[in-house]
């Protein structure tokens, strides 16, 4: 069918600035943490790991040393359900699905029965897709896995894991699930009525645009109303790196709020000082800002912004 202006889309990594960063800015505004604070002060699972001294600023600038990606979902897969390698650099008789450049996955595999169920229950509340529910313990195990991943050097390295940790910090400080915190502080009062994590709890499936035709981790199902990015999916759909669904109109409200120094429709949500800091601070080793990407004024080809974008963006 023809798309409608109120259709919801999976925002993917735009979740980072449309959701997680808003929550981080709000808590910073309230004096709940400092940028040079160590993230382990707010996430006990990181104490005693090589992440213990990583600061919140380093997470926001993507200079934490944490790898760009980690396949958390592999812990849920039954290794006895397939033969040979799960991944291949080239397609063969049992590896037809391409998921990246020179990377193909096994065609048939099963999940560990103790971690994945077909129906919802108190023990299996984390819905990944239709008829796919993860054990409640898996969300916490992801934080443990992040703690065990070896740190790399502290150069600029864009990482979804940085924002997964920031989401965990938001929840530990606010004592609320981040989706509910955002609803309370921003989305509901700003009348962003077409913005939500876990959109199928509020909207009909027909109101949500399908993301992919067949997802290999969801057993070839059409993905509609469930977050596509696997790390967010295996967090139960609410994550710091992905998971938010919205419309262009609602997304515009967030960035109008930021452009206007924390005010939207006559109401103040963030101080101008906090907005100025997060919008203008720039890394000393990359073009990145505090959570935001910024223009590369020295190389317009590599810049993520249009050439017409002003340098002060």
Give names to the regions the model predicted.
Residues 2-61, 149-162, 239-242:
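Short active-site loop at a secondary-structure junction
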Residues 52-312:
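Short, surface-exposed loop or secondary-structure junction motifs
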């Amino acid at each position: 069918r023809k798309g409608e202006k109120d259709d919801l889309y999976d925002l993917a990594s735009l979740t980072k600035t449309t959701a997680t960063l808003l929550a981080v800015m709000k808590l910073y505004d309230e004096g709940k943490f400092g940028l040079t604070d160590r993230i382990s002060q707010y996430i006990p699972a990181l104490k005693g790991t090589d992440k213990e001294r990583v600061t919140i600023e380093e997470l926001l600038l993507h200079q934490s040393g944490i790898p760009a990606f980690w396949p958390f979902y592999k812990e849920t897969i039954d290794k006895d359900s397939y033969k040979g390698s799960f991944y291949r650099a080239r397609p063969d008789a049992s590896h037809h699905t391409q998921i990246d450049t020179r990377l193909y996955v096994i065609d048939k595999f099963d999940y560990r029965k103790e971690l994945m169920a077909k129906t919802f229950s108190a023990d299996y509340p984390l819905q990944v897709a239709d008829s796919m529910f993860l054990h409640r313990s898996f969300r916490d195990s992801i934080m443990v896995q992040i703690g065990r991943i070896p740190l790399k050097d502290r150069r600029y390295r864009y990482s979804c894991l940085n924002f997964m940790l920031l989401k965990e910090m938001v929840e530990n400080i606010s004592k609320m699930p981040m989706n509910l915190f955002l609803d309370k502080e921003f989305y509901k009062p700003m009348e962003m009525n077409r913005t939500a994590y876990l959109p199928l709890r509020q909207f009909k499936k027909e109101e949500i645009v399908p993301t992919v035709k067949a997802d290999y981790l969801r057993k070839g199902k059409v993905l509609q109303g469930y977050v596509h990015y696997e790390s967010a999916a295996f967090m139960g759909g609410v994550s710091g790196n992905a998971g938010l669904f919205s419309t262009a109109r609602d997304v515009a409200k967030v960035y109008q709020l930021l452009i206007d120094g924390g005010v939207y429709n006559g109401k103040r949500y963030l101080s101008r000082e906090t907005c100025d800091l997060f919008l203008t601070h720039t890394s000393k080793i990359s073009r990145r800002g505090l959570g935001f990407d910024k223009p590369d004024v020295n190389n317009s080809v590599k810049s993520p912004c249009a050439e017409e974008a002003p340098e002060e963006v």
